[in-house]
């Protein structure tokens, strides 16, 4: 699918899927399992970052090595799975996807074997040329390498890519492949942090697609 036309890569958690409340709830299960403090939605959005082990260590006030993070990651995902059926798509997710004129794909740092059937459950599979999730047993890492592999499988040049996501890590991943990012304020990251990044920022997914079209047109 090697093409000079713009290609849109969507993030899933906190972007197309409105799961912020569930993520914060599951994160607090992790923190309280070690006797740590809980965080509010706003606190999570200010402090959350990848690698997630660094975020956990900051809140807990103690080092979190790989073995400990693996254990905490299992606790998180067990709690997350129990509430997943309560999550809905972002209010304008379907409208936003329909507004993009070119090809689009989905890349998530959630486990691939769970992501694919979940996307199908929401009736979205047909919108994407490819759906990729994490193919490892422990999550929490950064997105750049996964994006490189995702685009290689698609045979898409990174310079033709715009990524819509809700985190600074999404933007860093896009830059790493020579692409562009539009950041969405409805997810896991405080809007002030997103705006300070210098990347285009949108309060709705529909507006994010509009901005993605603008930045992709400017690069052509």
Each model region followed by its residue ranges:
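Conserved H-loop
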Residues: 37, 125-129, 157
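Short, acidic loop-to-helix structural element flanking the phosphoryl-transfer center
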Residues: 81-106, 112-116, 144
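A short, structured active-site edge motif that brings together acidic residues
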Residues: 43-44, 70, 125-140
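Helix-loop "lid/cap" segments that line or gate small-molecule binding pockets
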Residues: 28-31, 51-64, 118-121, 150
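Metal-dependent phosphoesterase signature
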Residues: 57-95
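Conserved Lys-Pro-Asp/Glu-containing loop-to-beta segment of HAD-superfamily phosphomonoesterases
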Residues: 7, 143-171
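Active-site neighborhood of HAD-like aspartate-dependent phosphohydrolases
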Residues: 1-46
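Acidic, Mg2+-coordinating phosphoryl-transfer loop and its flanking beta/alpha structural elements
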Residues: 162-201
